[in-house]
């Protein structure tokens, strides 16, 4: 396995921001050559990146036949768009190394949990914005290098409206709530350019209400974006793998009914 850590140095990046890769090394003995990759954005309310939603999930995807990478993005006091630029850089970086690491450059899915889901969905919504391309030294014709091929959103923060997780937006926007709150309420920014999306959430989530996902799914449907949505009756917020591997100290994060890992794209034989 190619296990490496790459520091991130985008404008506004904080010390400690980095990308970790979990790349299955190429072997002539294996039928799969280029594998899809899951780029994970852990949650944490934009105050931190959760350990439970990082390496355990990356290793699970690796065992399923994917390459994986974990983005430890800058959180508060870093503000928007620092973490979005770090995510854009990461997907560009992975595509630039696709041939070397046998990544299928057309099957890079961005996964995000909770506030990390907001970050992942933000790239899904804003990948073709000129400011993002410019931040990566790309021309207007090179936006596609920043586009995820799919989104996998786990109990995501989406809306800044009635059902908002206020803490996430306070940490992300600081004093610019009024200026940027609507722009970062992602259900209001969906177009048909958003990649195909898989979302799951629990009805019982008391931290990030399921309405966040429902609003986003409704917007995706109106825009004609291929979407799959699973809502589970039981389960607290932050389930991660929903099994013993990512269990919290109080045991809340074990919910076997939640099949939280569903294949978006199977590794393809070449």
Regions found by a protein language model. Name each.
Residues 1-32:
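N-terminal cap/lid segment of alpha/beta-hydrolase-fold proteins
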Residues 34-43:
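Short beta-strand element of the alpha/beta-hydrolase
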Residues 49-51, 71-105, 256:
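Catalytic nucleophile-loop/oxyanion-hole region of alpha/beta-hydrolase
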Residues 51-69:
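Short amphipathic alpha-helix adjacent to the substrate-entry channel of hydrolases
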Residues 92-167, 181:
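Primarily recognizes the serine-hydrolase "nucleophile elbow" in alpha/beta-hydrolase
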Residues 199-201, 205:
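Short beta-strand/loop motif that positions the catalytic acidic residue
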Residues 207-215:
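Conserved alpha/beta-hydrolase "acid-adjacent" motif
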Residues 262-268:
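Conserved small/polar residues in nucleotide/adenosyl-binding loops
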